UniProtKB/Swiss-Prot annotation:
It comes from Pongo abelii (Sumatran orangutan). It catalyses: N-{alpha-Glc-(1->3)-alpha-Man-(1->2)-alpha-Man-(1->2)-alpha-Man-(1->3)-[alpha-Man-(1->2)-alpha-Man-(1->3)-[alpha-Man-(1->2)-alpha-Man-(1->6)]-alpha-Man-(1->6)]-beta-Man-(1->4)-beta-GlcNAc-(1->4)-beta-GlcNAc}-L-asparaginyl-[protein] + H2O = alpha-D-glucosyl-(1->3)-D-mannopyranose + N(4)-{alpha-D-Man-(1->2)-alpha-D-Man-(1->3)-[alpha-D-Man-(1->2)-alpha-D-Man-(1->3)-[alpha-D-Man-(1->2)-alpha-D-Man-(1->6)]-alpha-D-Man-(1->6)]-beta-D-Man-(1->4)-beta-D-GlaNAc-(1->4)-beta-D-GlcNAc}-L-asparaginyl-[protein] (N-glucan mannose isomer 8A1,2,3B1,2). PANTHER family: ENDO-ALPHA-1,2-MANNOSIDASE, GLYCOPROTEIN ENDO-ALPHA-1,2-MANNOSIDASE. Residues 1-8 are cytoplasmic. The lineage of its organism: Eukaryota, Metazoa, Chordata, Craniata, Vertebrata. Its EC number is 3.2.1.130. The gene is MANEA. It is a single-pass type II membrane protein. This is Glycoprotein endo-alpha-1,2-mannosidase. The chain crosses the membrane at residues 9-29. GO terms for cellular component: Golgi membrane. Residues 60-462 are annotated as: Catalytic.
Amino acid sequence: MAKFRRGTCIILALFILFIFSLMMGLKMLRPNTATFGAPFGLDLLPELHQRTVHLGKSFDFQKSDRINSETNTKNLKSVEITMKPSKASELNLDELPPLNNYLHVFYYSWYGNPQFDGKYIHWNHPVLEHWDPRIAKNYPQGRHNPPDDIGSSFYPELGSYSSRDPSVIETHMRQMRSASIGVLALSWYPPDVNDENGEPTDNLVPTILDKAHKYNLKVTFHIEPYSNRDDQNMYKNVKYIIDKYGNHPAFYRYKTKTGNALPMFYVYDSYITKPEKWANLLTTSGSWSIRNSPYDGLFIALLVEEKHKYDILQSGFDGIYTYFATNGFTYGSSHQNWASLKLFCDKYNLIFIPSVGPGYIDTSIRPWNTQNTRNRINGKYYEIALSAALQTHPSLISITSFNEWHEGTQIEKAVPKRTSNTVYLDYRPHKPGLYLELTRKWSEKYSKERATYALDHQLPVS
């Protein structure tokens, strides 16, 4: 009997050892990219893989929201937990849609939080006073108080993030790529210079270029109206940008009709500077001319009023863009004027770049500006703008914006959020990625249509 028990124990021990060895072997087969709960070999099933990615993001958001809620309960606001994308959400480039380098999006890197910057930046934007004291007294004053109270009518899926967080930059590039956007126009101030509510951001450019290159995106520069901007310091700043960043593989160049590939610079509020000053920089006879030099480029002026057309010609600019996402707000942003603007540009050999946006609402920072709010209508407003832009057969289209949250023009993912004082807008009944999906749809349509009319208009096609 004892021998039988001993034999049984030996067999049982060998069986347990076999099961343990089998489990260890299966564990070794599990792919490195699998997240918790992901069965091994899931990458072989793309549809399941994508579904798991989506669920993983939902889990991360719920976790982040719970952390923020607990933080508020304890009144601890010194640290913001920035949501990290899971490894499973890193898609292969082969799984992403083709790029459209004729579709640009305006991108802002001015956000900050305590975790990466020691304080909140831009999320705590002040409420701006109306210039008429009689109107101003009817509205609240002060600053927003993140993370639950931010200077936006929508709430980001990533929370009140920092533009310095590498994982945030990575997520942004992935979202742009998923939307078939080829070029981001980076809001830019010279080194050690910043907007009145921010901090210097030029030191972020190398990381943004590197992350963009990972997704085969290109970066162009949207030069902001820094203090005392003129022909001389513009020359120095253009030289700085090209010398420092021009050799990076993600640095954007546009191939002109003559076959030259030149850097492109959007110049915000260009009308502030007199045409004579611009002509010093942008005409061949100018005293600070960049023309036919290593620092030559394509300079795109912001057209607000109709009269700016002739100032732009006199200045020597290479094209115009309209920026504002509010149809009817300015002459340039009004869809009905785009056809005539395109004819004007064709006549004078200028590049016409209409700017489209998903909507507009800035009442979180300008509560008195309700007349310029444009409802998104579940994506219809955006599609109307894109359709109007395509009808003009433009050389390029710009999107306002990827993440200008203060003015509610973002196509970045937003989520529902409610606090005791605020109910944020969101994209429901659609998913947080609605505007990325719509952008992808129209990018593909634009790419096909542009290929058909490019030869007739002698536009570059590569």
